[in-house]
Amino acid sequence: MTSPSDVMIDIDQLWSIFGQGEQAFAVHQDLNLQVHRGEMLSIVGGSGTGQTVVLRPSLGLLQPGKGRVTTLGRPAAELCRAGASARVGMLFQHGALYSAFSVLDNIAFALREQGGLPDAVVRQAAMIKLQMVGLKPEHASRNPADLSGGMIKRVALARALIMDPPLLLLDEPTAGLDPTSSDEFCALLRQLQADLGLTVVMVTHDLDTLFALSSRVAVLAEKRVLVSGTAQEVAQFDHPFTTTFFQGERGRRAMAPAPSATPLAAPASA
């Protein structure tokens, strides 16, 4: 049985409603989902199922039309209060860096906004996070326009971690990255999750990322969580979306075991 203290996010009977009156429509109806301490949960679903929308009430950015959302043991709406949001890190799909700020100032932004710390301490903390995500000290003075897509992701990740949050939310973390950069970013996320004891919730459409990172997968369909379990378990669930998503060519390729290296033949004797 899961202890209440081990439930990082508790979504209970959530209705996500947009519009008003006759124009109102529900993206989610009676959606239930719990996120447990230490797991890496991926949320997947077809077009229009509102995967990213699920993250918004968890951050207190969207008031549920109905239902209840608790994050880190308190009503999620309270995260909008001063200081409370520092306990949840958010990595947006395209990084969302401030173009007029240097890399260092982007990373340090939330810490500076909180106030109360000498600038030297803020800069040191930002430099630690910069190197934690695999960037070099000389990158600190660069502007976002001078960075590659992979570097932007790393800076955004460092910014999300600057307040040492126990909970990290990721929106399409490997979108726009080439396969090598995607693999490297996944390896970085795995290492940070292990080193920092993070709980991670991720929205992704990338099957390679899903299989590389997820300890559990929740599938959204029919305005609710249709099924959750390991990637291998949900891949076998009988539903049109899971069949198309997991059993198509991309899914089969992502689930295929990595080929073992062929040993080199011993050199022939002279």
Summary of predicted features, one role per range:
Residues 164:
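Conserved catalytic motifs of ABC-family nucleotide-binding domains
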Residues 59:
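Helix-to-loop junction immediately C-terminal to a conserved catalytic motif
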Residues 120-138:
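Conserved ABC ATPase "signature" region
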Residues 168-171:
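Catalytic Walker B motif of ABC-type/P-loop ATPase nucleotide-binding domains
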Residues 143-147, 151:
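Conserved ABC ATPase signature
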Residues 75-89, 113, 120, 234-237:
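ABC ATPase NBD coupling module
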